[in-house]
């Protein structure tokens, strides 16, 4: 597989550790950078577009990795010990002691582990029902108020949707939200049926009718959210799992960590999500629930042809493609796709949110309304093979990033927070260009103003010309994680079992086998896309290039030399250690 689909597979961003943010440096400059309130009316949260943290816990399923918590405003709750005054959920917790939790649930085998927590199989002590428990470890929560607010919001959203009963069967159910001295435990419905794309290529015969049925479920989730005042903001195939392995298993949405409450007419400015699925208005920092329909339209496009409608080999090129628009219905298999399907895709990917179909209107479109009568002719092997490689490449990167996450010590995160406060002399909560220059000069490490401006441009998410704690720490963590010689080599060695300095086909098949069961051809395709010198194996340099391409903050340095950017990071760390 080459061309568009190869670039798509290689550059798909793994954002588990930088939760869905596009560097400000690649976004268009707008005048809409003032934060909008996305508060929940119930908790009176004044968090200014507040989603963007939450816990991913590996989406509580095997093979998933925990996403990195985003920094918010610093200097408040969320960390600390187990006393009630340091509570994260507070009165929102169903169980408030370790003894109470142990009495109600029995923890079992680990399903996934990441930078900020662990997901385990668990069971109801009274009934034996199999469940999943996502534990957000207290010691891993940063000392920023937003972390606790994000957890509470995710819990509140899941509770609101779970309370709908049978009407919310397409959303994973939250059973309990518990808190003890160790952290927060979210006990949820266990989904063991696998990812959306895995099910598609496992069946062997994939048709437009099958795509229509899946799309109807996905858009149904969007409609359910919008009816209940919730905007999802991170719709993508990886956030949907099958409940079980049966042929008629329901498909369920499983991740609401970026979701927010909204009111009619409310506009949001925070750029969150996954780049391939972002609507133009999200990139232009003025959006509402219509953006979810766009994301669902991107998923539908991929379901029908195996590649995204707008793509690039890095975030900058992808953003440019999205803003330029234009849908390609010429390449295979589009000539054999029905006119009704193409009509719906076009209307969901309308660049104007005011004329884009609503979720309700999408469900009333003839193609989805009559999904059971959509063409039952195979879309062709090319679609299945594209989806298969996309899924396999994702899992390769997830495994590698999981190793990176495990090797990032808590103390390093704390160090960056303390660094921010030392440099924030006026306690404004923001670092200006002068703050950064002065902070380095005082510590005997003067840095050219152009390099300071580079850091500001790369890290300034909201475009206000300063770095808040979240922005400052996020960019430094990513620079350090991806440039520090300690982390990526450990991830490489995880795959290079024989230690010969190369990842070979057998090693990659063994590493991915438990989760994917990939065919030899799929693994060959992955290696071919990464193997730039065409020797049939992956060197460390090629592995590093794969990990860097298309990834959040690592691409923030694309306009500058990597050496200069890393040098600035080292000076900042050394000057404030």
UniProtKB/Swiss-Prot annotation:
UniProt-annotated location(s): Membrane
Lipidation residue positions, type N-myristoyl glycine: 2
List of residues binding Ca(2+) 2: 460, 462, 464, 466, 471
PROSITE patterns linked to this entry: EF_HAND_1, EF_HAND_2, PROTEIN_KINASE_ATP, PROTEIN_KINASE_DOM, PROTEIN_KINASE_ST
Alphabetical keyword list: ATP-binding, Calcium, Kinase, Lipoprotein, Membrane, Metal-binding, Myristate, Nucleotide-binding, Repeat, Serine/threonine-protein kinase, Transferase
The protein's enzyme class: transferase
Span list, region Autoinhibitory domain: 374-404
Main subcellular localisation: membrane
Alphabetized GO MF terms: ATP binding; calcium ion binding; calcium-dependent protein serine/threonine kinase activity; calcium/calmodulin-dependent protein kinase activity; calmodulin binding; protein serine kinase activity
Residues that coordinate or bind Ca(2+) 3: 496, 498, 500, 507
GO CC, any one term: nucleus
Binding positions for ATP per the UniProt entry: 111-119, 134
Notes on activation and inhibition: Activated by calcium. Autophosphorylation may play an important role in the regulation of the kinase activity.
Biological function: May play a role in signal transduction pathways that involve calcium as a second messenger.
Family membership: Belongs to the protein kinase superfamily. Ser/Thr protein kinase family. CDPK subfamily.
Protein's UniProt name: Calcium-dependent protein kinase 22
Species the sequence originates in: Oryza sativa subsp. japonica
Gene: CPK22
């Amino acid at each position: 597989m080459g061309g568009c689909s190869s670039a798509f597979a290689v550059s798909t961003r793994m954002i588990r550790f930088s939760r869905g943010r596009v560097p400000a440096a690649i976004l268009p400059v707008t005048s809409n950078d003032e934060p909008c309130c996305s508060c929940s009316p119930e908790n009176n949260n004044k968090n200014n577009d507040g989603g963007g943290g939450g816990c991913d816990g590996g989406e509580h399923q095997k093979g998933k990795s925990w996403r990195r918590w985003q920094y918010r405003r610093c200097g408040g709750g969320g960390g600390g010990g187990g006393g009630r005054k340091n509570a994260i959920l507070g009165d929102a917790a169903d169980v408030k002691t370790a003894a109470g939790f142990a009495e109600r649930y029995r923890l079992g085998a680990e399903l996934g582990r990441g930078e900020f927590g662990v997901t385990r199989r668990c069971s109801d002590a009274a009934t034996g029902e199999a469940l999943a428990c996502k534990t957000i470890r207290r010691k891993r929560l940063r000392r920023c108020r937003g972390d606790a607010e994000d957890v509470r919001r995710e819990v509140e959203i899941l509770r609101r949707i779970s309370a709908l009963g049978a009407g919310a069967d397409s959303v994973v159910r939250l059973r309990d939200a518990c808190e003890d001295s160790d952290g927060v435990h979210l006990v949820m419905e266990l989904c063991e049926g696998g990812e959306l794309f895995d099910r598609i290529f496992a069946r062997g015969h994939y048709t437009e009718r099958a795509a229509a049925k899946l799309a109807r479920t996905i858009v149904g989730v969007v409609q359910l959210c919008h009816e209940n005042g919730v905007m999802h903001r991170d719709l993508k195939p990886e956030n949907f799992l099958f409940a079980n392995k049966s042929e008629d298993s329901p498909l369920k949405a499983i991740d609401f960590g970026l979701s927010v409450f909204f009111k009619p007419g409310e506009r949001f400015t925070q750029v969150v999500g996954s780049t391939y699925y972002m609507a133009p208005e999200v990139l232009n920092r003025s959006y509402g629930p219509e953006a979810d329909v766009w994301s669902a339209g991107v998923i539908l496009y991929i379901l029908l042809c195996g590649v995204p409608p707008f793509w690039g080999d890095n975030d900058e090129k992808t953003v440019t493609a999205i803003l330029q628009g234009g849908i390609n219905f010429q390449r295979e298999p589009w000539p054999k796709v029905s006119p009704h399907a193409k009509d719906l895709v076009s209307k969901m990917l309308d660049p104007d949110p005011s004329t884009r179909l609503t979720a309700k209107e999408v469900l009333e479109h003839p193609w989805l309304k009559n999904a059971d009568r959509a063409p039952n002719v195979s879309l062709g092997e090319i679609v299945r093979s594209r989806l298969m490689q996309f899924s396999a490449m994702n899992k390769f990167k997830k495994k590698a990033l999981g190793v990176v996450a495990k090797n990032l010590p808590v103390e390093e995160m704390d160090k960056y927070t303390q660094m921010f406060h030392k440099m924030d002399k006026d306690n404004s909560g923001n670092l200006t260009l002068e703050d950064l220059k002065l902070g380095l000069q005082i510590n005997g490490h003067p840095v050219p103003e152009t390099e300071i401006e580079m850091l500001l441009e790369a890290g300034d998410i909201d475009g206000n010309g300063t770095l808040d704690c979240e922005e400052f720490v996020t960019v430094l963590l990513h620079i350090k994680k991806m440039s520090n010689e300690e982390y990526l080599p450990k991830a490489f060695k995880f795959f290079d079992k024989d230690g010969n300095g190369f990842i070979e086909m057998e090693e990659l098949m063994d590493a991915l086998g438990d989760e994917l069961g990939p065919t030899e051809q799929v693994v060959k395709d992955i290696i071919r896309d990464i193997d730039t010198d065409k020797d049939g194996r992956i060197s460390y340099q090629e592995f590093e290039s794969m990990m860097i391409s298309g990834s959040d903050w690592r691409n923030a340095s694309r306009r500058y030399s990597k050496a200069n950017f890393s040098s600035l990071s080292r000076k900042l760390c050394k000057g404030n250690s």
